[in-house]
Amino acid sequence: MKEIKVIIAGPRGRMGHEAVLLMERTEHFNLVAAVDYKHGGEKISDLPGMPALDTPIYGDLHTCLEEVEADVLLDLTTPEVGKQHVTLAVERGLRSVIGTTGFTEEELKQLTETAKEKAVGTIIAPNFAIGAVLMMKFSQMAAKYFQDVEVIELHHDQKLDAPSGTAVKTVELIRQNRESKQQGHPNEVEQLEGARGANVDGIHIHSVRLPGLIAHQEVMFGGDGQMLTVRHDSFNRASFMSGVKLSIETVMNLDHLVYGLENIID
């Protein structure tokens, strides 16, 4: 396979660290630069626990793009920074794979239009784990037969956004196969505000944040005398790397924006 030159934004994070290791062990990936505002001017090898790579680190993406030629930006930063980075990448005509979440419908619409106008491949993935993508697909299938459903997502306590992008995407897919319905008793009252979680078209989403967790989600469907639970667990960040690899390889052949890994797997 032809060499793919990659910039990683957010190499110090746990996902970023796994992504650097992915670059090192994948023959056709070439990590040409990294972006980290705290370590501009250093090299990847200067960061604790990183492999001995001479890859330069830039303090901001704008400067990096001025000096480095790349094929793909892999962004694993925070929601706010990720939004800035993907906007800049699309405007510059640089393909990007975005692993941050928190995009609004309006932001996605604008990015989709710009990516189409610029004919630049872009993938925004709420979850890179193939198993999580299958969980979403299975939930979408089940929604045709079970109208009563709630979502519980559980993540580490350093996650900034709630609910997770995976939970939001799951509900979007479920709604495609489910008529609008308010889940629960029509006269139910929350004795404590937020006790029933977020409500999206009658589907309740509950977010758990605790140390010791990585990324987990279960979708619970209830019916007369039965219950169906679809669950996925990521026990470490290595579970996301197959999806990252697939996304980087796939985005090279795209000329538009794709939201969700489920849209690039068979």
UniProtKB/Swiss-Prot annotation:
UniProt xrefs under Pfam families: DapB_C, DapB_N
Keyword Acyltransferase recorded: no
InterPro entries: DapB_C, DapB_N, DapB_N_CS, DHDPR_bac, NAD(P)-bd_dom_sf
Amino-acid positions noted as binding NADP(+) in the UniProt annotation, renumbered to this chain: 38
Keywords, ordered alphabetically: Amino-acid biosynthesis, Cytoplasm, Diaminopimelate biosynthesis, Lysine biosynthesis, NAD, NADP, Oxidoreductase
Alphabetized SUPFAM superfamilies for the sequence: Glyceraldehyde-3-phosphate dehydrogenase-like, C-terminal domain (SSF55347), NAD(P)-binding Rossmann-fold domains (SSF51735)
UniProt GO BP: diaminopimelate biosynthetic process; lysine biosynthetic process via diaminopimelate
Pathway membership: Amino-acid biosynthesis; L-lysine biosynthesis via DAP pathway; (S)-tetrahydrodipicolinate from L-aspartate: step 4/4
Domain of life (superkingdom): Bacteria
Compartment(s) of residence: Cytoplasm
Annotated catalysed reactions: (S)-2,3,4,5-tetrahydrodipicolinate + NAD(+) + H2O = (2S,4S)-4-hydroxy-2,3,4,5-tetrahydrodipicolinate + NADH + H(+); (S)-2,3,4,5-tetrahydrodipicolinate + NADP(+) + H2O = (2S,4S)-4-hydroxy-2,3,4,5-tetrahydrodipicolinate + NADPH + H(+)
PROSITE patterns, A to Z: DAPB
GO CC terms in record: cytosol
GO molecular function: 4-hydroxy-tetrahydrodipicolinate reductase; NAD binding; NADP binding; oxidoreductase activity, acting on CH or CH2 groups, NAD or NADP as acceptor
EC code: 1.17.1.8
Residue positions binding (S)-2,3,4,5-tetrahydrodipicolinate: 156, 165-166
Binding site for NAD(+): 10-15, 99-101, 125-128
Family membership: Belongs to the DapB family.
HAMAP family: DapB
Protein name (record): 4-hydroxy-tetrahydrodipicolinate reductase
Source organism of this protein record: Bacillus cereus (strain AH187)
